[in-house]
Amino acid sequence: MGLHNPLPSSLKSECKKAGKILTSFVDPRQTLGAQEVIPPSVLTNAKGLVIMTVLKAGFLFSGRIGSGLIVARLDDGTWSAPSAVMTGGMGVGAQIGSELTDFVIILNSKAAVQTFARLGSITLGGNLSIAAGPLGRNAEAGGGASVGGMAPMFSYSKTKGLFAGVSLEGSVLVERRDANRSLYRGDITAKRLLSGQVAQPAAADPLYRVLNSKIFNLNRGDEGDIYNDVPIYADDEPEDIWGPSSKSTKRRDSADRSSSYSRRGDSYRSNRSRAHDDDDEDDYSFSRSKSLSRKTAGGSLRSSKMDNRRSKYADTPSPRRSRSYSDEDEESVYSSDVSTESSSQFSSRSSEYSKPSRPTAPKPKFKQDSLGPNQARAMYSFAGEQPGDLSFQKGDIIDIVERSGSHDDWWTGRIGYREGIFPANYVKLS
Protein backbone atom coordinates (compact mmCIF):
# COMPACT_ATOMS: atom_id res chain seq x y z
CA MET A 1 0.00 0.00 0.00
CA GLY A 2 1.43 3.37 -1.01
CA LEU A 3 1.17 6.45 1.16
CA HIS A 4 -1.43 9.01 0.12
CA ASN A 5 -1.79 12.60 1.23
CA PRO A 6 -4.51 13.06 3.90
CA LEU A 7 -4.27 16.86 3.88
CA PRO A 8 -6.74 18.90 1.82
CA SER A 9 -5.34 19.71 -1.62
CA SER A 10 -6.65 20.82 -5.01
CA LEU A 11 -9.52 18.84 -6.49
CA LYS A 12 -7.28 17.86 -9.40
CA SER A 13 -4.88 16.17 -6.96
CA GLU A 14 -7.79 14.58 -5.10
CA CYS A 15 -9.00 13.01 -8.36
CA LYS A 16 -5.57 11.50 -9.03
CA LYS A 17 -5.40 10.16 -5.48
CA ALA A 18 -8.94 8.79 -5.68
CA GLY A 19 -8.18 6.94 -8.91
CA LYS A 20 -5.16 5.25 -7.34
CA ILE A 21 -7.01 4.33 -4.16
CA LEU A 22 -10.00 2.97 -6.03
CA THR A 23 -7.94 0.66 -8.27
CA SER A 24 -6.29 -0.82 -5.17
CA PHE A 25 -9.73 -1.81 -3.85
CA VAL A 26 -11.34 -3.19 -7.01
CA ASP A 27 -8.57 -4.90 -9.04
CA PRO A 28 -7.22 -8.31 -7.87
CA ARG A 29 -3.93 -7.52 -9.62
CA GLN A 30 -3.37 -4.67 -7.15
CA THR A 31 -4.61 -6.43 -4.00
CA LEU A 32 -3.88 -9.71 -2.23
CA GLY A 33 -6.17 -11.62 -4.56
CA ALA A 34 -9.70 -12.08 -5.85
CA GLN A 35 -11.07 -12.53 -2.32
CA GLU A 36 -9.84 -9.10 -1.19
CA VAL A 37 -11.66 -6.88 -3.70
CA ILE A 38 -14.96 -5.03 -3.59
CA PRO A 39 -17.45 -7.30 -5.41
CA PRO A 40 -18.33 -6.17 -8.96
CA SER A 41 -22.03 -6.51 -8.05
CA VAL A 42 -21.59 -3.87 -5.34
CA LEU A 43 -19.74 -1.54 -7.72
CA THR A 44 -22.31 -1.96 -10.51
CA ASN A 45 -25.20 -1.11 -8.17
CA ALA A 46 -23.43 1.76 -6.39
CA LYS A 47 -25.28 5.08 -6.46
CA GLY A 48 -22.24 7.02 -5.31
CA LEU A 49 -18.73 6.78 -3.86
CA VAL A 50 -16.71 8.56 -1.21
CA ILE A 51 -12.95 8.06 -1.59
CA MET A 52 -10.61 9.59 0.97
CA THR A 53 -7.45 9.25 3.07
CA VAL A 54 -7.58 9.88 6.84
CA LEU A 55 -4.70 10.42 9.27
CA LYS A 56 -5.27 9.66 12.95
CA ALA A 57 -2.52 10.30 15.47
CA GLY A 58 -2.11 11.11 19.14
CA PHE A 59 -1.14 10.20 22.67
CA LEU A 60 -4.03 10.37 25.17
CA PHE A 61 -5.42 13.26 23.10
CA SER A 62 -5.79 12.42 19.44
CA GLY A 63 -6.56 14.26 16.23
CA ARG A 64 -8.06 13.14 12.97
CA ILE A 65 -7.91 14.81 9.56
CA GLY A 66 -8.68 13.54 6.09
CA SER A 67 -9.63 14.65 2.60
CA GLY A 68 -11.03 13.15 -0.57
CA LEU A 69 -14.04 13.44 -2.84
CA ILE A 70 -17.59 12.27 -3.44
CA VAL A 71 -19.08 11.37 -6.82
CA ALA A 72 -22.58 10.17 -7.78
CA ARG A 73 -23.98 7.93 -10.50
CA LEU A 74 -26.63 9.76 -12.54
CA ASP A 75 -29.91 8.33 -13.83
CA ASP A 76 -28.43 7.69 -17.30
CA GLY A 77 -25.60 5.59 -15.84
CA THR A 78 -22.84 8.18 -16.23
CA TRP A 79 -20.99 9.81 -13.34
CA SER A 80 -21.35 13.31 -11.98
CA ALA A 81 -18.61 15.87 -11.54
CA PRO A 82 -16.82 15.20 -8.22
CA SER A 83 -17.07 17.36 -5.11
CA ALA A 84 -14.14 17.72 -2.72
CA VAL A 85 -14.78 16.66 0.90
CA MET A 86 -12.89 16.64 4.18
CA THR A 87 -13.24 15.35 7.73
CA GLY A 88 -11.59 16.17 11.03
CA GLY A 89 -11.99 15.85 14.77
CA MET A 90 -10.46 15.42 18.20
CA GLY A 91 -10.65 12.62 20.75
CA VAL A 92 -9.57 11.67 24.26
CA GLY A 93 -9.01 8.38 26.01
CA ALA A 94 -6.60 5.47 25.91
CA GLN A 95 -5.41 6.14 22.41
CA ILE A 96 -1.82 6.01 21.25
CA GLY A 97 -0.08 5.72 17.92
CA SER A 98 -0.69 6.90 14.38
CA GLU A 99 -2.56 5.52 11.44
CA LEU A 100 -2.97 6.39 7.76
CA THR A 101 -6.09 4.86 6.25
CA ASP A 102 -7.55 4.83 2.75
CA PHE A 103 -11.34 4.58 2.67
CA VAL A 104 -13.79 3.69 -0.09
CA ILE A 105 -17.39 4.19 1.03
CA ILE A 106 -20.09 2.81 -1.26
CA LEU A 107 -23.35 4.76 -1.23
CA ASN A 108 -25.99 2.10 -1.93
CA SER A 109 -29.01 4.37 -2.15
CA LYS A 110 -29.97 7.64 -3.78
CA ALA A 111 -31.07 8.82 -0.35
CA ALA A 112 -27.46 8.67 0.84
CA VAL A 113 -26.34 10.82 -2.09
CA GLN A 114 -29.25 13.24 -1.70
CA THR A 115 -28.56 13.65 2.02
CA PHE A 116 -25.06 14.88 1.33
CA ALA A 117 -26.18 16.96 -1.66
CA ARG A 118 -28.92 18.67 0.35
CA LEU A 119 -26.96 19.35 3.55
CA GLY A 120 -23.42 19.62 2.20
CA SER A 121 -22.38 17.13 4.87
CA ILE A 122 -23.08 13.62 6.09
CA THR A 123 -22.38 11.86 9.40
CA LEU A 124 -21.02 8.36 8.97
CA GLY A 125 -23.22 6.13 11.08
CA GLY A 126 -25.35 9.12 12.09
CA ASN A 127 -27.56 10.43 9.27
CA LEU A 128 -27.35 7.01 7.65
CA SER A 129 -26.11 3.67 8.96
CA ILE A 130 -22.83 2.28 7.69
CA ALA A 131 -21.65 -1.34 7.63
CA ALA A 132 -18.56 -3.26 6.61
CA GLY A 133 -19.03 -4.24 2.98
CA PRO A 134 -18.75 -7.76 1.57
CA LEU A 135 -15.45 -8.87 0.03
CA GLY A 136 -14.56 -11.16 -2.85
CA ARG A 137 -15.10 -11.20 -6.59
CA ASN A 138 -18.12 -13.51 -6.34
CA ALA A 139 -19.69 -11.99 -3.22
CA GLU A 140 -23.14 -10.43 -3.45
CA ALA A 141 -24.23 -7.01 -2.24
CA GLY A 142 -26.62 -8.68 0.22
CA GLY A 143 -23.61 -10.08 2.07
CA GLY A 144 -23.27 -6.80 3.93
CA ALA A 145 -26.97 -6.40 4.66
CA SER A 146 -28.20 -5.72 8.14
CA VAL A 147 -31.35 -7.11 9.73
CA GLY A 148 -33.43 -4.29 8.30
CA GLY A 149 -32.07 -4.75 4.78
CA MET A 150 -28.93 -3.63 2.95
CA ALA A 151 -27.08 -0.82 4.71
CA PRO A 152 -27.22 2.57 2.96
CA MET A 153 -23.41 2.66 3.03
CA PHE A 154 -20.66 0.04 2.80
CA SER A 155 -17.24 0.88 4.18
CA TYR A 156 -13.90 -0.50 2.96
CA SER A 157 -10.51 0.49 4.34
CA LYS A 158 -6.79 -0.23 4.15
CA THR A 159 -4.54 0.92 6.95
CA LYS A 160 -0.84 1.63 7.31
CA GLY A 161 0.31 2.07 10.90
CA LEU A 162 -1.10 1.21 14.32
CA PHE A 163 -3.78 3.00 16.30
CA ALA A 164 -5.95 1.68 19.11
CA GLY A 165 -9.45 2.80 19.98
CA VAL A 166 -10.56 5.03 17.09
CA SER A 167 -13.29 4.38 14.52
CA LEU A 168 -14.37 6.50 11.56
CA GLU A 169 -18.01 5.95 12.50
CA GLY A 170 -19.48 9.22 13.73
CA SER A 171 -17.14 11.33 11.60
CA VAL A 172 -18.71 14.15 9.61
CA LEU A 173 -17.87 14.60 5.94
CA VAL A 174 -18.14 18.22 4.78
CA GLU A 175 -17.92 19.59 1.25
CA ARG A 176 -14.89 21.79 0.47
CA ARG A 177 -16.31 24.73 -1.41
CA ASP A 178 -12.89 26.35 -1.72
CA ALA A 179 -11.54 23.41 -3.76
CA ASN A 180 -14.74 23.22 -5.82
CA ARG A 181 -14.62 26.96 -6.49
CA SER A 182 -11.01 26.75 -7.64
CA LEU A 183 -11.63 23.99 -10.19
CA TYR A 184 -15.08 24.96 -11.44
CA ARG A 185 -14.44 28.73 -11.41
CA GLY A 186 -17.51 29.62 -9.44
CA ASP A 187 -19.44 29.08 -6.22
CA ILE A 188 -20.60 25.59 -7.18
CA THR A 189 -22.43 23.59 -4.51
CA ALA A 190 -22.26 19.83 -4.02
CA LYS A 191 -25.96 19.66 -4.87
CA ARG A 192 -25.32 21.00 -8.38
CA LEU A 193 -22.30 18.75 -8.87
CA LEU A 194 -23.93 15.51 -7.71
CA SER A 195 -27.13 16.14 -9.67
CA GLY A 196 -25.27 16.38 -12.99
CA GLN A 197 -25.76 20.12 -13.54
CA VAL A 198 -22.02 20.64 -14.03
CA ALA A 199 -19.98 19.03 -16.82
CA GLN A 200 -17.31 16.46 -16.01
CA PRO A 201 -13.92 18.23 -15.63
CA ALA A 202 -10.93 16.97 -17.59
CA ALA A 203 -8.92 17.09 -14.34
CA ALA A 204 -10.96 14.11 -13.10
CA ASP A 205 -9.92 11.83 -15.99
CA PRO A 206 -7.82 9.50 -13.72
CA LEU A 207 -10.97 8.89 -11.67
CA TYR A 208 -13.34 8.45 -14.63
CA ARG A 209 -10.98 5.91 -16.23
CA VAL A 210 -11.72 3.63 -13.28
CA LEU A 211 -15.42 4.47 -12.97
CA ASN A 212 -16.01 3.81 -16.68
CA SER A 213 -14.35 0.38 -16.60
CA LYS A 214 -16.32 -2.87 -16.94
CA ILE A 215 -16.51 -3.68 -13.24
CA PHE A 216 -18.67 -0.61 -12.59
CA ASN A 217 -20.95 -1.35 -15.55
CA LEU A 218 -21.42 -5.13 -15.64
CA ASN A 219 -24.13 -6.73 -17.74
CA ARG A 220 -25.40 -10.26 -17.24
CA GLY A 221 -23.75 -11.45 -20.42
CA ASP A 222 -20.29 -10.12 -19.57
CA GLU A 223 -17.68 -12.87 -19.57
CA GLY A 224 -13.93 -13.20 -19.61
CA ASP A 225 -11.54 -10.82 -17.89
CA ILE A 226 -13.69 -8.05 -16.45
CA TYR A 227 -10.61 -6.32 -15.02
CA ASN A 228 -8.62 -5.91 -18.24
CA ASP A 229 -9.56 -2.23 -18.67
CA VAL A 230 -8.84 -1.12 -15.10
CA PRO A 231 -5.82 1.22 -15.14
CA ILE A 232 -2.76 -0.04 -13.28
CA TYR A 233 -0.80 2.30 -11.03
CA ALA A 234 2.72 1.56 -9.76
CA ASP A 235 3.43 2.97 -6.28
CA ASP A 236 7.06 3.70 -7.17
CA GLU A 237 6.07 5.87 -10.14
CA PRO A 238 5.19 9.59 -10.01
CA GLU A 239 1.58 10.34 -9.13
CA ASP A 240 0.55 11.43 -12.61
CA ILE A 241 1.66 8.31 -14.53
CA TRP A 242 -1.41 6.23 -15.35
CA GLY A 243 -2.57 3.11 -17.09
CA PRO A 244 -0.87 0.09 -18.59
CA SER A 245 0.70 2.15 -21.37
CA SER A 246 2.72 5.34 -21.52
CA LYS A 247 0.22 7.53 -23.42
CA SER A 248 -0.36 9.77 -20.43
CA THR A 249 3.39 10.06 -19.96
CA LYS A 250 3.78 11.13 -23.57
CA ARG A 251 1.10 13.77 -23.12
CA ARG A 252 2.87 15.12 -20.05
CA ASP A 253 6.28 15.11 -21.72
CA SER A 254 4.87 16.89 -24.76
CA ALA A 255 3.31 19.55 -22.55
CA ASP A 256 6.58 19.96 -20.64
CA ARG A 257 8.55 20.43 -23.86
CA SER A 258 6.05 22.99 -25.13
CA SER A 259 6.15 24.87 -21.85
CA SER A 260 9.96 24.85 -21.77
CA TYR A 261 10.13 26.72 -25.07
CA SER A 262 7.62 29.39 -24.11
CA ARG A 263 8.92 29.99 -20.56
CA ARG A 264 12.72 29.83 -20.51
CA GLY A 265 15.36 30.33 -17.86
CA ASP A 266 14.49 31.66 -14.43
CA SER A 267 10.99 32.57 -15.52
CA TYR A 268 10.26 28.95 -16.35
CA ARG A 269 11.73 27.62 -13.14
CA SER A 270 9.77 30.04 -11.02
CA ASN A 271 6.52 29.29 -12.80
CA ARG A 272 6.80 25.61 -11.96
CA SER A 273 6.17 26.50 -8.32
CA ARG A 274 2.71 27.92 -9.00
CA ALA A 275 -0.17 26.62 -6.88
CA HIS A 276 -2.37 23.72 -7.94
CA ASP A 277 -5.31 26.07 -8.26
CA ASP A 278 -3.96 27.51 -11.51
CA ASP A 279 -3.60 24.01 -12.91
CA ASP A 280 -7.19 23.25 -11.98
CA GLU A 281 -8.46 26.25 -13.92
CA ASP A 282 -6.53 25.21 -17.03
CA ASP A 283 -7.85 21.67 -16.81
CA TYR A 284 -11.47 22.69 -16.46
CA SER A 285 -11.26 24.91 -19.57
CA PHE A 286 -11.01 21.68 -21.57
CA SER A 287 -13.96 20.00 -19.82
CA ARG A 288 -16.51 18.01 -21.73
CA SER A 289 -19.80 19.56 -22.80
CA LYS A 290 -22.58 18.55 -20.41
CA SER A 291 -25.08 17.76 -23.10
CA LEU A 292 -22.71 15.40 -24.88
CA SER A 293 -21.08 13.76 -21.86
CA ARG A 294 -24.23 11.91 -20.85
CA LYS A 295 -25.02 8.49 -22.30
CA THR A 296 -28.16 8.51 -24.46
CA ALA A 297 -30.74 5.71 -24.37
CA GLY A 298 -29.43 2.68 -26.22
CA GLY A 299 -26.08 4.36 -26.83
CA SER A 300 -22.68 3.54 -25.45
CA LEU A 301 -20.63 5.67 -23.10
CA ARG A 302 -17.75 5.58 -25.56
CA SER A 303 -19.86 6.93 -28.41
CA SER A 304 -21.06 9.77 -26.17
CA LYS A 305 -17.49 10.74 -25.44
CA MET A 306 -16.65 10.52 -29.14
CA ASP A 307 -19.53 12.81 -30.04
CA ASN A 308 -18.36 15.28 -27.45
CA ARG A 309 -14.80 15.29 -28.73
CA ARG A 310 -16.02 15.64 -32.32
CA SER A 311 -18.06 18.66 -31.34
CA LYS A 312 -15.06 20.17 -29.65
CA TYR A 313 -12.87 19.95 -32.71
CA ALA A 314 -15.58 20.82 -35.22
CA ASP A 315 -15.82 24.26 -33.61
CA THR A 316 -12.05 24.76 -33.72
CA PRO A 317 -10.66 23.93 -37.19
CA SER A 318 -7.17 25.00 -36.18
CA PRO A 319 -5.30 23.85 -33.05
CA ARG A 320 -4.60 25.92 -29.97
CA ARG A 321 -1.05 27.16 -30.43
CA SER A 322 -0.88 29.91 -27.81
CA ARG A 323 1.50 28.04 -25.49
CA SER A 324 3.48 26.17 -28.10
CA TYR A 325 6.71 27.08 -29.82
CA SER A 326 5.65 26.92 -33.47
CA ASP A 327 7.69 26.28 -36.59
CA GLU A 328 7.13 29.88 -37.71
CA ASP A 329 8.42 31.22 -34.38
CA GLU A 330 11.53 29.09 -34.62
CA GLU A 331 12.20 30.25 -38.17
CA SER A 332 11.69 33.87 -37.15
CA VAL A 333 14.11 33.60 -34.22
CA TYR A 334 16.69 31.86 -36.38
CA SER A 335 16.39 34.40 -39.17
CA SER A 336 16.73 37.27 -36.71
CA ASP A 337 19.86 35.77 -35.16
CA VAL A 338 21.48 35.19 -38.55
CA SER A 339 20.59 38.69 -39.74
CA THR A 340 22.07 40.33 -36.64
CA GLU A 341 25.25 38.28 -36.81
CA SER A 342 25.70 38.87 -40.55
CA SER A 343 25.16 42.62 -40.21
CA SER A 344 27.79 42.85 -37.49
CA GLN A 345 30.33 40.86 -39.48
CA PHE A 346 29.88 42.80 -42.70
CA SER A 347 29.94 46.21 -41.03
CA SER A 348 33.24 45.41 -39.32
CA ARG A 349 34.80 44.26 -42.56
CA SER A 350 33.21 46.71 -44.98
CA SER A 351 36.62 48.13 -45.86
CA GLU A 352 37.83 44.71 -46.99
CA TYR A 353 34.80 43.02 -48.47
CA SER A 354 31.61 43.96 -50.26
CA LYS A 355 28.32 42.15 -49.80
CA PRO A 356 27.85 39.48 -52.53
CA SER A 357 24.81 39.74 -54.79
CA ARG A 358 22.00 37.18 -54.77
CA PRO A 359 22.30 34.24 -57.20
CA THR A 360 20.55 34.82 -60.51
CA ALA A 361 19.31 31.24 -60.71
CA PRO A 362 15.74 30.62 -59.46
CA LYS A 363 15.27 29.00 -56.06
CA PRO A 364 14.79 25.23 -56.21
CA LYS A 365 11.36 23.92 -55.22
CA PHE A 366 11.69 20.85 -53.06
CA LYS A 367 8.76 18.53 -53.62
CA GLN A 368 7.07 16.92 -50.64
CA ASP A 369 6.61 13.19 -50.50
CA SER A 370 3.63 12.16 -52.59
CA LEU A 371 0.66 10.65 -50.76
CA GLY A 372 -0.91 7.27 -51.42
CA PRO A 373 -4.65 6.76 -51.97
CA ASN A 374 -5.24 6.02 -48.26
CA GLN A 375 -2.88 8.56 -46.79
CA ALA A 376 -3.24 12.09 -45.43
CA ARG A 377 -0.81 14.80 -44.42
CA ALA A 378 -1.11 16.56 -41.04
CA MET A 379 -1.77 20.28 -41.52
CA TYR A 380 -1.60 20.95 -37.78
CA SER A 381 -0.05 19.23 -34.78
CA PHE A 382 -2.40 17.21 -32.57
CA ALA A 383 -1.51 16.12 -29.03
CA GLY A 384 -3.87 13.33 -28.00
CA GLU A 385 -5.79 14.04 -24.84
CA GLN A 386 -7.28 10.63 -24.10
CA PRO A 387 -6.24 6.98 -24.43
CA GLY A 388 -6.85 5.88 -28.00
CA ASP A 389 -5.96 9.25 -29.57
CA LEU A 390 -3.34 9.30 -32.35
CA SER A 391 -0.88 12.13 -31.72
CA PHE A 392 1.07 13.64 -34.61
CA GLN A 393 3.12 16.64 -35.70
CA LYS A 394 2.50 19.02 -38.58
CA GLY A 395 3.74 17.39 -41.79
CA ASP A 396 3.42 13.79 -40.61
CA ILE A 397 1.95 11.31 -43.09
CA ILE A 398 -0.92 9.25 -41.67
CA ASP A 399 -2.21 5.95 -43.07
CA ILE A 400 -6.02 6.11 -43.01
CA VAL A 401 -7.51 2.94 -41.49
CA GLU A 402 -11.14 4.03 -41.29
CA ARG A 403 -12.84 7.25 -42.27
CA SER A 404 -16.24 8.79 -42.91
CA GLY A 405 -17.32 11.13 -45.67
CA SER A 406 -16.98 14.24 -43.50
CA HIS A 407 -13.98 16.19 -42.26
CA ASP A 408 -15.99 17.31 -39.22
CA ASP A 409 -15.54 13.86 -37.75
CA TRP A 410 -13.02 11.53 -36.10
CA TRP A 411 -11.10 9.13 -38.32
CA THR A 412 -8.91 6.16 -37.44
CA GLY A 413 -5.31 6.22 -38.61
CA ARG A 414 -1.88 4.71 -38.14
CA ILE A 415 1.64 6.13 -37.95
CA GLY A 416 4.19 3.34 -37.82
CA TYR A 417 3.07 0.96 -35.08
CA ARG A 418 0.79 3.53 -33.41
CA GLU A 419 -2.92 3.48 -34.22
CA GLY A 420 -5.76 5.66 -32.92
CA ILE A 421 -8.39 8.25 -33.71
CA PHE A 422 -7.78 11.88 -34.70
CA PRO A 423 -9.76 14.96 -35.84
CA ALA A 424 -10.22 14.76 -39.61
CA ASN A 425 -10.12 18.54 -40.03
CA TYR A 426 -6.46 18.50 -38.94
CA VAL A 427 -5.30 16.64 -42.07
CA LYS A 428 -5.43 16.98 -45.84
CA LEU A 429 -5.89 14.13 -48.28
CA SER A 430 -3.92 13.77 -51.50
UniProtKB/Swiss-Prot annotation:
Chain positions with Phosphotyrosine modification: Y325
Annotated Pfam families: SH3_1, Ysc84
Residue positions where Phosphothreonine is found in the record: T316
UniProtKB keywords: Phosphoprotein, SH3 domain
Modified residues (Phosphoserine): S285, S318, S324, S326, S354, S406
Compositional bias ranges of the Low complexity kind: 333-358
Biased composition (Basic and acidic residues): 263-277, 304-313
Gene3D superfamilies found in the cross-reference section: SH3 Domains (2.30.30.40)
GO MF term list: actin filament binding; phosphatidylinositol binding
Highest taxon in the source lineage: Eukaryota
Annotated InterPro entries: SH3-like_dom_sf (IPR036028), SH3_domain (IPR001452), SH3_domain_YSC84-like (IPR051702), SYLF_SH3YL1-like (IPR033643), Ysc84_actin-binding (IPR007461)
Family listed: Belongs to the SH3YL1 family.
Name of protein: SH3 domain-containing protein PJ696.02
Species whose genome carries this gene: Schizosaccharomyces pombe (strain 972 / ATCC 24843)
